[in-house]
Amino acid sequence: ADSKMDGPRPCTILAVNPEKVIRAQQDRTLLEQLRTADLLIPDGIGVILAMRLLGLGQAERVPGSELMPKLCGRAVAKGYSVFLFGASAEVNQQAVAALQRRYPGIQIVGSHHGYVKEDEMPSVISLINECQPDLLFVALGSPHQELWMSRYLPQLQVKVCQGVGGTFDVLAGHVRRAPKI
């Protein structure tokens, strides 16, 4: 993430699982978002096995719910600011509180729930830009977050944007992480 902080456009980080690969075969917008993402992280044993079968190396599973906390730790160390967008208002605020407890000194400059009507989106985009976050975490679930990023990222003034699926629910304690296999 450090190398992307001074880039000319936002860096996008997306997790790829078998369900997303299958859906992208029918959804051109999702496929394009996956093709143009700066970093695709393998989130699922099916993707890992496919990569190995295709001779694409010995990748390891990197769930978005594990990468986001690592980026938050880096944000504290480097002074990067963070914005959380998505989930319900309650879960969003609980995720903010959980990150503040886990990472003292984290600069969470704003947050907004993900239940936004289309006509309200310009004000959400304005809010995110006014807060000037370095890192934007989008928790709308897949493929909604990827499609949202495809549509709105060009209007945002963020440096790194990661789709994090249900990670806010995990941080808030509403959902347990899947066990490691």
Residue ranges and their predicted role:
Residues 1-66:
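N-terminal nucleotide/polyanion-binding subdomain common to many enzyme families
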Residues 128-142, 158:
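Proline-aspartate-enriched helix->loop->beta-strand connector
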Residues 17-21, 140-145, 167:
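Short glycine-rich anion-binding loops that position phosphate/pyrophosphate groups of nucleotides
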Residues 38, 109, 134, 159:
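Conserved acidic residues
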Residues 48-127, 131:
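Conserved beta-alpha
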Residues 28, 32-36, 146-166:
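A short, gly/pro- and small-residue-rich
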Residues 10, 80, 156-159:
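A short helix->loop->beta-strand "cap" motif at the edges of active sites that frequently abuts
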Residues 113-119, 159-181:
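Short, flexible loop segments at boundaries between secondary-structure elements
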